């Protein structure tokens, strides 16, 4: 009888265990995130409101830029940089409706994606979607060399 009870519980435990693992995997930490909000104005997500939510809830916010596009639906791309790592779940808490991704590439790569400049300028499909005059940024754009120590680079160059 005891083994039947354990067998009955096993699928529940596995499902709960897998959900916890999935949450752990998704709840990564990062200095930089890209967010996309579809139909932002219908949901009250103006650029001003986005900035207000970021400033009010993320004390380590260093830089944010955003721009609007018209694809299959109107949407806003947002790129944020924090001074310290922020959990995915924290960003999701305040931007539930947004598609959120941990950033790949440099700060400049991500800003260029939002602006549709750099390599994105030659992509006609992206240029057609860009809505001129909607790009906004707040804070100073961090350098691409995050994590590199200039004093160590100088020392290395002196040794060579």
Task: Annotate each predicted stretch with a short phrase.
Residues 1-58, 83-160:
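Catalytic "initiation/cleavage/transfer" segments centered on a nucleophilic residue
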Residues 58-71:
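Short, glycine- and small/hydrophobic-rich beta-strand elements in well-ordered beta-sheets
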Residues 80:
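Extracellular, beta-strand-rich glycan-interacting domains
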Residues 32-34, 61-63, 77:
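Beta-strand-rich binding-surface signature
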Residues 71-77:
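The conserved glycine-aromatic submotif of the RRM
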């Amino acid at each position: 009888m005891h083994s039947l009870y354990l067998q009955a519980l096993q699928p529940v435990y596995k499902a709960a265990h897998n959900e916890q693992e999935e949450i752990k995997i998704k709840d990564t930490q990062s200095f930089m995130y890209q967010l996309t909000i579809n139909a932002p104005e219908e949901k009250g997500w103006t650029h001003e409101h986005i900035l207000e939510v970021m400033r009010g809830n993320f004390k380590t916010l260093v830089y944010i830029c955003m721009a609007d596009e018209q694809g299959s639906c109107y949407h806003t791309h947002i790129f944020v940089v924090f001074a310290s790592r922020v959990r995915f779940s924290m960003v999701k808490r305040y931007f539930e409706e947004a598609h959120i991704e941990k950033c790949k590439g440099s700060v400049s790569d991500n800003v260029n994606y939002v602006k549709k400049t750099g390599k994105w300028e030659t992509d006609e499909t992206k240029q057609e979607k860009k809505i001129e005059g909607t790009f906004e940024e707040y804070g100073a754009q961090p350098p691409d060399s995050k994590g590199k120590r200039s004093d160590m680079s100088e020392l290395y160059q002196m040794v060579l």
